[in-house]
Amino acid sequence: MQDEGVDMKKLLLRSSDEVRVIAPSCSMRKIDSSVIERAQERFRCLGLNVAFGDHVYDEDFLGSASVDKRVADLHAAFADKKVKLILTAIGGFNSNQLLQHIDYALLKKNPKLLCGFSDVTALLNAIHAKTGMPVFYGPHFSTFGMEKGIEFTIECFKNTFFYGRCDILASETWSDDMWFKDQEHRQFITNPGYEIIHRGDMVGMGVGGNISTFNLLAGTEYEPSLKKSILFIEDTSRMSITDFDRHLEALTQRDDFCTVRGILIGRFQKDSGIDMDMLRKIISRKKALDAIPLFANVDFGHTTPHCILPIGGMIRVNVDRKCITVQLHSSVEQLPE
C-alpha cells in the first residue's frame, strides 16, 4: 500500500536534477558504448545530469557485480541528496539476490523516483512492499540509447516524471527487433491498439511487472499486496503459452487475488508464439478472471516503445477512451472498498 508520508509532488524532476544509474542485475559492460553515449545525450537534452554508481561496470563469472557492490550502489543512490531519479542500467536474472541485504529504513527515509523493468521486477516490488514507496516499471537507462522509435517512451517519461501525470494511449507503431545490435535496420509494425478482452473501467494501485520474476516473490516478505490493485504483467520471448498459463494460474490462486480490480497485459514478443487468439482462450478458461476488466497488447515489457506504470501508485483505465492514466498525486487510500 502507498506510504501516505511520500509527497510525490516533491519528487518530480526539474531541470539540472541528477539521474543515478545503477546495475542491480547485469553489469553495464553488456551495453555498447555508443548506446551509453546516446542515452547520456538524451538526458542532457532533457536538462538532466547523469551519474553512475561506482560498481556498474563490475562483473563476475555470471555477468554481475557482487551482491555487496550492487547493494552499495543502491544505498549510495538513495542516500545522496543530489539524486532525484534512479534508473537501472539493464535487466538480467538476479536482482532478487539483493533483497535480504537492503536497508529498507534508509530507502524509506530518502524516497526517490526509481525506474526499471524485466528482472528488476523483484527489486521494485520488494522495495514497495517493505517501504510503501511508489516505484516505477518502465525503461532502463540503456533504453534511451535507442536511435529510432524512442519518441513515445520519452514523452511518457517527461509526462510521468516531470509533470506527474501521463495519459497513455496505444502507440502508433511498435518493434521487437534487436535494436541494440542494429540501430539502422529497424522494423516497425503498425499497432492495432489495446486488445480489450474484458470490458470495464479500472481504478486501483499498480502492481506487477515481469510475471515469472514477480512470482519469485510468492510467500516471501517481499511479496506486495494485490489489494485494490491494477495488476500488470508481461514476459520475454522465452515465455511459452504453457509457461504463461501456469504463471497466471499461480497468481489467481493467491488469497488476495479476489481483490484485483483490473489486469493489463504487456505486448508479447513475436518469438513467444503467443497471439491474441491463444491469449483469449487462456483467459476464458480461468473463472477467477471472469469479472475482472482486462486489457492486453499494452506498451510495456520487452518490446518497444515503453510506457511507465507505477508499483504502489494510482492507475485509471477508461475503456471508452482506451486510455490508461497514471497520476502520481492520487492516493490509493481514497479508493472505496
UniProtKB/Swiss-Prot annotation:
A single GO BP term for this record reads: proteolysis
Tell me one Pfam family matched here. Peptidase_S66
- What Enzyme Commission number does this protein have? 3.4.16.-
Query: Has the keyword Nucleotidyltransferase been applied to this entry?
Result: no
Active-site feature positions: 118 (nucleophile), 234 (charge relay system), 302 (charge relay system)
SUPFAM superfamilies reported in the protein's UniProt record? Class I glutamine amidotransferase-like, LD-carboxypeptidase A C-terminal domain-like
Return the InterPro entries for the record: Carboxypeptidase_A_C_sf (IPR027461), Class_I_gatase-like (IPR029062), LdcA_N (IPR027478), Peptidase_S66_N (IPR040449), Peptidase_S66C (IPR040921), S66_fam (IPR003507)
Swiss-Prot/TrEMBL keywords: Carboxypeptidase, Hydrolase, Protease, Serine protease
Full protein name: Putative carboxypeptidase TP_0688
